[in-house]
Curated annotation (Swiss-Prot):
Reaction(s) this enzyme catalyzes, per UniProt: ATP + H2O + 4 H(+)(in) = ADP + phosphate + 5 H(+)(out)
E.C. number: 7.1.2.2
Name this protein carries in UniProt: ATP synthase subunit beta
Gene: atpD
Subunit structure as annotated in this protein's UniProt entry: F-type ATPases have 2 components, CF(1) - the catalytic core - and CF(0) - the membrane proton channel. CF(1) has five subunits: alpha(3), beta(3), gamma(1), delta(1), epsilon(1). CF(0) has three main subunits: a(1), b(2) and c(9-12). The alpha and beta chains form an alternating ring which encloses part of the gamma chain. CF(1) is attached to CF(0) by a central stalk formed by the gamma and epsilon chains, while a peripheral stalk is formed by the delta and b chains.
Family: Belongs to the ATPase alpha/beta chains family.
Organism this protein belongs to: Rhizobium leguminosarum bv. trifolii (strain WSM2304)
Enzyme type, top EC level: translocase
């Protein structure tokens, strides 16, 4: 997609009404187009308004991208002649910007060669690549059981404290190492504290350099919980625009959205103020369209790919709620983080039975990978079914066959753990990026009983099977 040209400044209007985040502006001359950005100054600060509706002959209804406190009727507003334009390119790496592309990390101005409009059309059918490829992450449990599609969309489900952020950071790190790709993180309705923690953790784990520049691998775009709904409804698009630029440069980009539910929630807040009649559970009537317009832009083209990992909050654990239900329709894979696995000390705490992927198909991953993954899942499923018997009667009451299955399942569980690069700081063990062939080979040997003689402890927090064998020798010698 071509870079947008520098817009011509259009007509000047005046504020006629302010209702929270919605501002009406009257123009005497030409009316600005829908989605155009209007600018005014509010208490000495640049305030951007986005045109949402045309009312009558000379009035437009707009959504404010920042607080509208202090705005008065009669105040001058100018049309920029284009949608919101944000800086894109390598200069954005390691920096934090807001919905309108202004840096908010106190590391100086953000000057880039290109700016790009946040509203873009999805790539045409001709531009899209239809080839099904998996994106190897170097994380065993993901690559084996719920592989990510290159240019696919992954839903990341998990409560507080089970390791969503660490998994996100490891993915950023591994994609940069294995594919030389960049990442973009969009914090949508995030807690400011969490956003700040993520920024500093990225610097500590060498994902980014302080103040951006050479060596940084991720660009951050934040619209926190305290921002008006206009900013939260558009910040995901700002992040996506930065990611699209990298994709069009031929990169494999990882695009993180935390949290996709807040994008919908912000849209519903704005919708009511715009006078739209709400639909089911009070959501905006345009829910599916808003979600579809954003999700369709996340795709693989013939030049590069955007692979999106979206954290999804499920209100009241109700998966039939319109917001998560609309998100599910777009997902290619789900990675479910489980508290019960985290409690066993197994990290990443990915649930091997609940996580799914449409890429786990013999036509895509090959017969061997598919067979090994299914055997691993059936062994773990059998262990899960036997757990009640073990808890009541103990291991001795099981048949010999079941005892072997349980022993293998426990080894598989431990072998699904692995040390992360970004966790080196607090675990003290060096991170491991495991090649897909090594992952398949290791688990194939495990389910076929080749490693039944090795102790359970040898499989915990190692990378490849060779390391597990080495660890077993050390344990035997100790």
């Amino acid at each position: 997609m071509a870079e947008a040209a520098t817009p011509k400044i259009g007509s000047v209007g005046r504020v006629t009404q302010v209702i929270g985040a919605v501002v009406d502006v009257a123009f005497e001359g030409e009316l600005p187009k829908i989605l155009n950005a209007l600018e005014t100054t509010n208490n000495g600060v640049r305030l951007v308004l986005e045109v949402a509706q045309h009312l009558g002959e000379n009035e437009v209804r707009t959504i404010a991208m920042d607080s509208s406190e202090g705005l008065v009727r009669g105040q001058e507003v100018s049309d920029t002649g284009a949608p919101i334009m944000v800086p894109v390119g390598n200069e954005t790496l390691g920096r934090i910007m807001n919905v309108i592309g202004e840096p908010v990390d106190e590391a100086g101005p953000l000057v880039t060669a290109h700016k790009r409009a946040i509203h873009q059309d999805a790539p045409s059918y001709v531009e899209q690549s239809t080839e099904a490829q998996i994106l190897v992450t170097g994380i065993k449990v993901v690559d084996l059981l719920a592989p990510y599609a290159r240019g696919g969309k992954i839903g990341l489900f998990g409560g507080a404290g089970v390791g969503k952020t660490v998994l996100i950071m490891e993915l950023i790190n591994n994609v940069a190492k294995a594919h030389g790709g960049y990442s973009v993180f969009a914090g949508v309705g995030e807690r400011t504290r969490e956003g700040n923690d993520l920024y500093h953790e990225m610097i500590e784990s060498n994902v980014n350099k302080h103040g951006g520049g050479e060596g940084s691998k991720a660009a951050l775009v934040y619209g926190q919980m305290n921002e008006p709904p206009g900013a939260r409804a558009r910040v995901a698009l700002t992040g996506l625009t930065v990611a699209e630029h990298f994709r069009d440069q031929g990169q494999d980009v990882l695009f993180f959205v935390d949290n996709i539910f807040r994008f919908t929630q912000a849209g519903s807040e704005v919708s009511a103020l715009l006078g739209r009649i709400p639909s089911a559970v009070g959501y905006q009537p345009t829910l599916a369209t808003d979600m579809g317009q954003m999700q369709e832009r996340i795709t693989t083209t013939t030049t590069g790919s955007i692979t999106s990992v979206q954290a999804i909050y499920v209100p009241a654990d109700d998966l039939t709620d319109p917001a998560p239900a609309t998100s599910f329709a777009h997902l290619d894979a789900t990675t479910v983080l489980s508290r019960s696995i985290a409690e066993k000390g197994i990290y990443p705490a990915v649930d091997p039975l609940d996580s799914t992927s449409r890429m786990l198909d013999p036509m895509v991953v090959g017969e061997e990978h598919y067979e090994v993954a299914r055997k691993v899942q059936s062994t773990l499923q059998r262990y899960k079914a036997l757990q009640d018997i073990i808890a009541i009667l103990g291991m001795d009451e099981l048949s010999e066959e079941d005892k072997i299955a349980v022993a293998r399942a426990r080894k598989i569980e431990r072998f699904l753990s692995q040390p992360f690069f970004v966790a080196e700081v607090f675990t003290g063990s060096p991170g491991k990026l495991v090649a897909l062939e090594d992952t398949i080979k290791g688990f194939k040997g495990l389910v076929n009983g080749e490693y039944d003689h090795l102790p359970e402890a040898a499989f915990y927090m190692v990378g490849s099977m060779e390391e597990a064998i080495e660890k077993a020798k050390k344990l035997a010698a100790a």
